[in-house]
Amino acid sequence: MKRVGQLYERICEPENLRLAFLKSARGKRGKREVGAYAGRLDENLRLLREQLLARRADVGHYHFFTVHDPKERLICAAAFPERVLHHAVMNVCEPVLERYAIHDSYACRAGKGMHAAVRRAQGFAARFPWHLKLDVRKYFDSIAHDRLLALLARRIKDADVLRLFAEIVGTYHTQPGRGLPIGNLVSQHLANFYLGHLDHWVKETLRVAGYVRYMDDFVLWGGDRAELAGHLAAARAFLDAELGLALKENVQLNRSERGVPFLGYRVYPGRLALGPRARGRFARKLRGYEREWNEGAWSEADLARHMEALLSYVRFADTVALRRRIVGRYGTAA
């Protein structure tokens, strides 16, 4: 694939920077830092452009917080001016990374997403009798900066863009030379791109027809157990040698008819069920919502709004009985 150049000038264009602000501010206009930036928008965008043209981007200003959904994760949110920069970079560079992506990579891509990945997995489960479900141990924390930048250099020949990526990546590490922060736009795209190297190896070297990846969760399907066991050994070696990554121990090598755990669902050839962890998370959130309502913190309208967002996840699976119970209890559309 031909490398792409002359990207940095496009990142610096005033029109691109203004578009980056609009994307960064979408749905966040009520936040103080967004309002402060918007109040002096022309001046702030001019400053950002000057910093980029001087090759002195101001990066590395993060706010850290922890979420539990379901496991504990440290989220690293960039300050708003830096989020504008991230959008400016990805406005121009995302199409370059997109051209490298295979069809069956589903994270951080327009027209893809979690539900499309699950439906594709269901189609493969109907075609192939065996599946191999894998995911990477501490994925974001384990990404090697030097290997990531080397992979980017195979796609991009603009030295200024590569330098800017190196500066952004270098602002965060979990150990020397490793780690991308969870919660940043650039990190999400780069993390998805990093495993694109695995995607091409699976499709072009192993020649696996049934394969789906959503970030660091991926599934291979095949005709028999021995074939997939061989792919497992090869995948371990490839990830270690090429990307410096290791697989989690919870390998799932089983018959497709028994269901594959994928993205919170149990995917069978003919139906979708909620996985046990997703059911537990749903129950905990439901109890929390009921408590807010009973204690008067939420109105019925508040309850309905939160319940709709919660039900959108379970509605995708075969959960008619569960949703009928919700309707009977709360009168919420399911």
Language-model region placement:
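Right-hand nucleic-acid polymerase module
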Residues: A78, H87, T171, A229-G230, ...
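Gly/Ser/Thr-rich beta-alpha loop segments that engage phosphate groups in nucleotides
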Residues: V34, P181, L185, R266
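Conserved polymerase palm-domain catalytic core
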Residues: N44, Q51-R55, V59-G60, H103-D104, ...
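Short, hydrophobic/amphipathic alpha-helical patches that form generic packing surfaces
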Residues: L19, K23, N91, E167, ...
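Conserved two-metal-ion catalytic palm core of "right-hand" nucleic acid polymerases
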Residues: M1-K157, Y172-H173
